[in-house]
Amino acid sequence: MEDLDALLSDLETTTSHMPRSGAPKERPAEPLTPPPSYGHQPQTGSGESSGASGDKDHLYSTVCKPRSPKPAAPAAPPFSSSSGVLGTGLCELDRLLQELNATQFNITDEIMSQFPSSKVASGEQKEDQSEDKKRPSLPSSPSPGLPKASATSATLELDRLMASLSDFRVQNHLPASGPTQPPVVSSTNEGSPSPPEPTGKGSLDTMLGLLQSDLSRRGVPTQAKGLCGSCNKPIAGQVVTALGRAWHPEHFVCGGCSTALGGSSFFEKDGAPFCPECYFERFSPRCGFCNQPIRHKMVTALGTHWHPEHFCCVSCGEPFGDEGFHEREGRPYCRRDFLQLFAPRCQGCQGPILDNYISALSALWHPDCFVCRECFAPFSGGSFFEHEGRPLCENHFHARRGSLCATCGLPVTGRCVSALGRRFHPDHFTCTFCLRPLTKGSFQERAGKPYCQPCFLKLFG
């Protein structure tokens, strides 16, 4: 602050010698943008009195003079000749100095903490020497032809001055010999030691803590929701709950093809999830017809599994109805085709026997087909006669064998008379004219008819 007081006194002296005609017309002061706010931290040491006139391009560098004893100032003209210019400049300078006094400490300490102390000290010494060389060459008063900067320009120059102050600090009291000591920065609580710098682990924990607190403020849950069933690590954020466990969404995948199963259906086998394709391909039963996995409805028959549309007759390809199916050598058949292909045949019609049948003459017969093969009359009493492997009634059987009575046409079952190439009942072998029995065994034959001897002589003499 001592340098600033000297700066103010030099400015008053210089502005008092400015001619009134050379002073430019003052512009009205513009509202200043308030500087950024910083927390005030008092400092000790000589670094506060930095060389405010170190920048050769600074607006107020013209008032800086060497530190040699100042000669006696000449008699100043009456104050009334430059009272307008001086009053406006002093008011503007007072406002700038107030802003500088409020912000220079915190800005300097904050920026200087980013540079090593050795480099800062050496830079300060070099800058101090360069400033001492430059100060005598500067003019003692500003050029009368240059216009006076406005309040906004002064604020910008003040910001530039503050930026230069943040680059170096001049130490007024340095030891005569020995290494350069860094400036001592004091905090508000001077009795407490400065906190140690956080280690890498502490910084990481701090960052994680800040991240979790920020996520919590945004409504994102950060608490662990259990351990992942795949990687066994804590879960934070999105979670998939399935099979009685919690999973990371990227770890809940198919056990076969590793496809993510977060929003799709899946199947479980031995505690592991599988997508439908892998599950059916690996664990579904195979169809006995097409050998493909069965996904939905299934028919179990003949010791294997079938698609419903594939369990059909192997002969006609028709699906089985309510009547069921028949099996032959492990292959299913419908009733019609099975009976047509494998059912026993009727000896009479050669058709398949579906229901009742009669077994006779070493063959199977439909009940309606087992009749006399000559007259097709059913057998009364269940008895029949067989001739050359064919069933016959009694009359047709004796007719085939020639054992019918030539007179009455009935079968001859007992005693018989064989004559004229035919058989007769004994009572039915008589004379054709007188009808007497021909018991004596002698008869005459005429046109295939038997006659007794008297009738034959009488008729045919």
UniProtKB/Swiss-Prot annotation:
Cellular component terms (Gene Ontology): cytoskeleton; cytosol; focal adhesion; intracellular membrane-bounded organelle; nuclear matrix
Domain named LIM zinc-binding: residues: 226-285, 286-343, 344-403, 404-461
Subcellular location per the Swiss-Prot or TrEMBL entry: Cell junction, Focal adhesion; Nucleus matrix; Cytoplasm, Cytoskeleton
Modified residues (Phosphotyrosine): Y38, Y60
Motif (LD motif 3): 157-168
Result for mutant: C313A: No effect on interaction with CBLC
Polar residues: compositionally biased ranges: 40-52, 183-192
Region Interaction with PTK2B/PYK2, residue ranges: 1-240
The UniProt record lists the keyword Flavoprotein: no
Stretches for region Interaction with PTK2/FAK1: 83-136
Modifications the protein undergoes after translation, according to the UniProt entry: Phosphorylated by gonadotropin-releasing hormone-activated SRC.
Region (Transcription activation): 1-200
Modified residues (Phosphoserine): S68, S137, S140, S141, S143, S164, S186, S192, S194, S403
Domain of life of the source: Eukaryota
Quaternary data: Homooligomer. Interacts with PPARG. Interacts with TRAF4. Interacts with CRIP2. Interacts with HSPB1. Interacts with ILK. Interacts with LIMS1 and LIMS2. Interacts with NCK2. Interacts with NUDT16L1. Interacts with PAK. Interacts with PTPN12. Interacts with TCF3. Interacts with TCF7L2. Interacts with VCL. Interacts (via LD motif 3) with GIT1. Also interacts with GIT2. Forms a complex with ARHGEF7. Interacts with AR/androgen receptor in a ligand-dependent manner. Interacts with CSK. Interacts with PTK2/FAK1 and PTK2B/PYK2. Interacts with SLC6A3 and SLC6A4. Interacts with NR3C1.
Entry remark concerning the domains of this protein: The LIM zinc-binding domains mediate glucocorticoid receptor coactivation and interaction with AR, CRIP2, ILK, LIMS1, NR3C1, PPARG, TCF3, TCF7L2, SLC6A3 and SMAD3. The LIM zinc-binding 2 and LIM zinc-binding 3 domains mediate targeting to focal adhesions and actin stress fibers. The LIM zinc-binding 3 and LIM zinc-binding 4 domains mediate interaction with TRAF4 and MAPK15. The LIM zinc-binding 4 domain mediates interaction with HSPB1, homooligomerization and targeting to the nuclear matrix. The LIM zinc-binding 3 domain mediates interaction with PTPN12.
PANTHER family, per database record: PAXILLIN-RELATED, TRANSFORMING GROWTH FACTOR BETA-1-INDUCED TRANSCRIPT 1 PROTEIN
Family note: Belongs to the paxillin family.
Name used for this protein in its record: Transforming growth factor beta-1-induced transcript 1 protein
Source organism of this protein record: Homo sapiens
